[in-house]
Amino acid sequence: SVESPSQKTSVQISLATNLLESARAEIAPDSHLSVYRLGIEPRGSQLVLTGDVDSVQARVQTLQRFKAAGIPLVDETVVLPASGLGDATWGICNISTGAGREKPSHTAEMGTQLLMGEVVRIFKRVDDSYLSWYLVQSSDGYICWLPPENVVRCTREQADAWTSKPLLIVTQFEAQVRSEPRADS
């Protein structure tokens, strides 16, 4: 029996999807600790690899698996951080406790918490019609989504300068931070 073009495409998609899931299990087994959000998309007679990864190595290893299996595809993966962020791919949590969400939604499960002053790596920004979110990696390695108002973006150098400064702990219920010393404070 001869396969029709749609049957052939369906078989290719199935093989490619299985190969991608196998690669994900080995390259990025814990989705809480690495970004490996890839998918297979059919476009005409071609298969397209789309999505995000957090390292060049993850992308290369994935592409090598497809090549070794003889499955041709068009690569449209993005290695994060996203180029649109410029040099400010780091951030500092600016609220007492930041709720790191599993998905970019306030109703999504909380995956981790960030403390004020904690430095995060910013991978990308997602905007919808009402809200924006950053995909970040916390200092303990967890990947989560934070609203932009919970993070002050900065460069790697600024983040390093921040972490090299002494830590101040305020034990009063109410305090004020002033830019200069005052005799009456």
What are these regions (language model features)?
Residues S6, V60, Q64-L85, S105, ...:
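Boundary regions of SH3-family modules and the immediately adjacent low-complexity/disordered segments
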Residues S4-G44:
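Gly/Ser-centered flexible loop/linker motifs
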Residues K124-S132:
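Short, conserved beta-turn/loop elements at beta-strand boundaries and strand-helix junctions
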Residues E21, V60, Q64, T112-L115:
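Solvent-exposed, polar/charged alpha-helical surfaces in well-ordered, non-transmembrane soluble domains
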Residues S1-V2, D54:
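N-terminus-biased targeting/localization segments
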Residues L33-L63, S132:
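Short glycine/threonine-rich beta-strand-turn micro-motifs
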Residues C93-I122, V170-S185:
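Beta-loop motif signature
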